[in-house]
Amino acid sequence: AQRGIDVIPEIDMPGHFLAAITQYPDLACDGLIGWGETFSSPICPGKDTTLEFCQDVFKEIFDLFPYEYVHMGGDEVEKNNWKKCPRCQKRIRTEGLKSVEDLQAWFVRDMEKFFLANGKKLIGWDEVVADGLTSDAAITWWRSWSKEAVPMATSQGQRVIACPNEYFYFDYAQD
């Protein structure tokens, strides 16, 4: 802040959470830990204990970083486990959802409610733009091929942080 720069932490969930899941296997859908077809296994949003863990992680982050925004990630979620998980399927029914995509949107909205209740605003990768976030949220647009994300976010009153992958990924030329 002294130099006009805020370091905004990102704790990516519900996907990209394998480091935590490896240490706390109960965070995942039962017996479904490791790599899926494309990405690592996500947390199990069907378990209340997993939701509490996620909130506890962010409580600590909120205490450490005094900034208005905190990044929750939300990108590249492997949802195949959720299709097989009885707890996730129960959550889908209980919440009146229709699909695992709706389950992710529910999780993101639930986390945003938690953020706002704690005086913070959520930032998410552009995959969460259609999840029904409030105008308090901000979207980080990284998928330059996803042209609809920016107009969708701004039409919902959300701020957009533009960081298209081909220009802002330092390893892009080597990847």
What are these regions (language model features)?
Residues L27, I43-P45, W125-V128, Y169-F170:
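Generic preference for hydrophobic/aromatic residues in regular secondary structure cores
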Residues A20-I21, L27-C29, R91-I92, D136, ...:
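Alpha-helix boundary/interfacial micro-motifs
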